[in-house]
Amino acid sequence: MLKSSKHEDSSSKKNQNNKLIFIVRQLFYLIKHFFSKTKTPDNFFGIIKRLKINSQKMSLDEFNILANLLKLEDKIVEDIMVPRSDIIAIKLTTNLEELSESIKIAVPHTRTLIYDGTLDNVVGFIHIKDLFKALATKQNSPLKRLIRKHIIAAPSMKLLDLLAKMRRERTHIAIVVDEYGGTDGLVTIEDLIEEIVGRIDDEHDQQLDSANFKVINNSTIIANARIEVELLEEIIGEKLKNDDDEFDTIGGLVLTRVSSVPAIGTRIDISENIEIEVTDATPRSLKQVKIRLKNGLNSDNLT
């Protein structure tokens, strides 16, 4: 009996592995097709057909990866880019010692943009391992020698085209520029991968999630202004956005009630129950707000 059970388990695992290998292989063929200069519709739809036949055997994760990949064809850079206001970058004139400290304190990523003069003149990016290697070997290298190249993308560029360009150019970062050549945002290879496989949380993401939305007590919430309004609606159990509203974030909600970016300390009545106070902002954008609930939170919404 034990031998039979082990044999069945082994056979089941083998079948699951074979199925997963098939799905992954077909997905890679599909991606390769998008990157190919000579795309053939017959090959493309043949792959889709083979995947469709096996779709009933797919796990939910496998199916979602396939669905996300197919959706990617319709998405553009503007849909996923990190906006200019959220970009963290370092001046080209920064020396290696200062750069090391800046990255430790303020930069949570392995790659950091370098700009000359203003953020509209990004000269490339550095990888943290190159920096620490230079420091460890006590190389007195100018920052320029550590800079890796980035690529330029328009907001309207297709994500699949950007993915192909990153692959050709062997780079992980694209700077998104507007019609005047100014920096509009950035996209990383990780952003593109997450569009296919879903969000990949690391320790830093978990720390950010905790910092971005924090329930202080029954009547007070501290939130990043870029948090989606839908999350706030779910927590407080109150509708704040109409179907025809064009904003998505808490910051957008605030800006619909005032004519310009409000100063720190400004309080805005959103409804009879909700008051929002600006706790952090720049002249161009809201950063953080304090949400006061006059009637308090409904505990049922927190479970």
Curated annotation (Swiss-Prot):
**UniProt xrefs under CDD domains:** CBS_pair_CorC_HlyC_assoc (cd04590)
User: Gene3D superfamilies attached here?
Assistant: 3.30.465.10, CBS-domain (3.10.580.10)
The record's annotation in SMART domains points to:
CorC_HlyC
InterPro entries the UniProt entry points to: CBS_dom (IPR000644), CBS_dom_sf (IPR046342), FAD-bd_PCMH-like_sf (IPR036318), FAD-bd_PCMH_sub2 (IPR016169), Ion_transp-like_CBS (IPR044751), Transptr-assoc_dom (IPR005170), UPF0053_domain (IPR051676)
Database matches in Pfam families: CBS, CorC_HlyC
Q: List the disulfide bonds.
A: none
What keywords does the record list, in alphabetical order? CBS domain, Cytolysis, Hemolysis, Repeat, Toxin, Virulence
Gene Ontology molecular-function annotations: flavin adenine dinucleotide binding; toxin activity
Query: What induces or represses its expression, per the UniProt entry?
Result: Expressed at 30 minutes post-infection during the period that most rickettsiae escape from phagosomal vacuoles into the host cytosol.
Return the PROSITE patterns for the record. Answer: CBS
* One record GO biological process: killing of cells of another organism
Residue ranges annotated for the CBS domain, each copy included: 81-143, 146-203
Task: Fill in the misc note.
Answer: Transformation of Salmonella with tlyC results in the escape of transformants from endosomal vacuoles into the host cell cytosol. According to PubMed:17301007, the hemolysin protein was detected only in the virulent strain ATCC VR-142 / Breinl and not in the avirulent strain Madrid E, at their current detection limit of 10 fmol.
Q: Which family does it belong to?
A: Belongs to the UPF0053 family. Hemolysin C subfamily.
**Could you identify this protein by its name?**
Hemolysin C
Upper classification of the source organism reads: Bacteria, Pseudomonadati, Pseudomonadota, Alphaproteobacteria, Rickettsiales
Give the gene name.
Answer: tlyC
